[in-house]
């Protein structure tokens, strides 16, 4: 934004293009003509100035209550066996973030859960605004930048609108006299293009897939479940869509705690028989474990050390693990490992979704440390598939290398502990031909 001077005419056109929410919306024809008239840099700077000055409403994804209800019913009726594959029936190479885990998938893998994001609206309906306000160490959240950032911070986020995510291309065109020039063609300015740009320029807290939570509750035949980090309510949503009957959990964030009440009320109205839910507003280190009944599966994705800054600047910030345990050894020894031990002590199974955090270039081996602490209960790990996309075709020497990369299955780790005589994939295991003919001969 160096040497920037507001173009009053352009700024006025942005004002005129906005509705009650103050968000400028330009259709393709208008967007192209304004790019041609003012140039992309002038457009970008004035748009950044406009957002910083007028503070339009942040363009959240539109999710109606009908969308949420349809998503819930679809998730409830979905057979999660379809997304669970035992290791011996996985036919592609599995790729972990780190290749030197002491308990790697190659040696200790049990199988895969390949859950789609299809059902994310079931919880995102309640939580997306809070999730988009949650930043990380060194990275601001999109909603926070939009609402509080200066023009330069916003300008940095807007660049992708003119760089491909918006179908904008620098195209050679000829005028009526045959003179050739390059123009920016394609694209538009709407809610989707704004949020797509801000996704690339900021940090967005991860949403856990409710369908994966349901799969884990189903594969363990769980009736009572424990979640020591309720987070964005995604595992709560998976619980309501599963056959489980009682959910116990905790979270120190007062903002999400209020939303859990809304989730519980809405979901129970969609069921013929209401489910029992008890959630404490506290950190997992302060959970009254003695008040819990016997738990079938404790499944959580704990707050990684120094990663997401939940409820920063809000009420009870001091109760968050990132604030309360601000050194790795304290986080590990006073929070992470004791919580895992206490959860295992009251549960038949313990499933923990965590990867080693890396802060300022230093990797902390949280995964191996967890397994070493609970080694006598360790079953192995389940790979939770994530979608991996290469940053640039320039990373690959040829199309074959790119195809090989894209053909791998990238995973996050779910570390599993509990009953060693239980086959977690028994309901999704496909019989081979030998087993089929052996059964036919009986």
Q: Model-flagged regions — what are they?
A:
Residues 1-84, 92-93, 100-113, 131, ...:
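Class I S-adenosyl-L-methionine-dependent methyltransferase catalytic core
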Residues 95-98, 115-122, 126, 131:
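OB-fold ssDNA-binding interfaces and closely related basic DNA-contact patches used
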């Amino acid at each position: 934004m160096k040497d920037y001077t507001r173009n009053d005419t352009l700024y006025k056109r942005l004002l005129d293009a906005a509705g009650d929410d103050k968000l400028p919306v330009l259709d393709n024809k208008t967007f192209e003509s304004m790019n041609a008239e003012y140039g992309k840099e002038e457009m970008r700077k004035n748009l950044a100035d406009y957002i910083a000055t007028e503070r339009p409403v942040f363009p959240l994804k539109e999710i109606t209550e009908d969308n949420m209800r349809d998503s819930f019913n679809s998730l409830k009726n979905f057979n999660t066996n379809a997304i669970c594959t035992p290791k011996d029936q996985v036919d592609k190479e599995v790729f972990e973030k780190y290749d030197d885990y002491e308990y790697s998938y190659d040696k200790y893998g049990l199988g895969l859960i390949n859950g789609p994001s299809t059902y994310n609206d079931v919880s995102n309906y309640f939580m997306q605004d809070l999730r988009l306000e949650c930043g990380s160490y060194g990275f601001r959240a999109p909603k926070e930048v939009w609402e509080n950032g200066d023009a330069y911070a916003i300008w940095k986020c807007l660049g992708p609108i003119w760089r491909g995510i918006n179908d904008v291309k620098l195209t050679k065109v000829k005028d009526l006299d045959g003179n050739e020039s390059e123009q920016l063609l394609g694209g538009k300015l709407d809610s989707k293009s704004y949020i797509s740009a801000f996704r690339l320029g900021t940090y967005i807290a991860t949403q856990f897939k409710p369908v994966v939570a349901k799969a884990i509750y189903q594969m363990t035949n769980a009736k009572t479940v424990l979640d020591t980090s309720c987070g964005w309510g995604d595992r709560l949503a998976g619980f309501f869509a599963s056959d489980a009957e009682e959910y116990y959990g905790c979270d120190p964030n007062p903002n999400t705690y209020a939303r859990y009440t809304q989730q519980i009320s809405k979901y129970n109205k969609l069921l013929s028989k209401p489910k029992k839910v008890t959630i404490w507003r506290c950190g997992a280190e302060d959970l009254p474990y003695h008040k819990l009944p016997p738990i079938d599966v404790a499944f959580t994705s704990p707050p990684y050390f120094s990663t997401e800054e939940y409820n920063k600047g809000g009420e009870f910030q001091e109760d968050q693990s990132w604030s309360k345990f601000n050194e790795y050894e304290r986080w590990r020894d006073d929070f992470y490992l004791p919580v895992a031990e206490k959860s295992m002590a009251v549960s038949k199974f313990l499933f923990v979704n965590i990867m080693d955090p890396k802060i300022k270039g230093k990797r902390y081996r949280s995964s191996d440390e967890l397994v070493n602490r609970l080694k006598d209960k360790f079953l192995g790990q389940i790979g939770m598939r994530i979608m991996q996309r290469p940053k640039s075709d320039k990373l690959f020497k040829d199309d074959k290398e790119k195809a090989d990369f894209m053909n791998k299955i990238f995973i996050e780790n779910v570390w599993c502990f509990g009953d060693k005589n239980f086959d977690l994939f028994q309901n999704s295991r496909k019989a081979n031909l030998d087993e089929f003919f052996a059964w036919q001969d009986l």
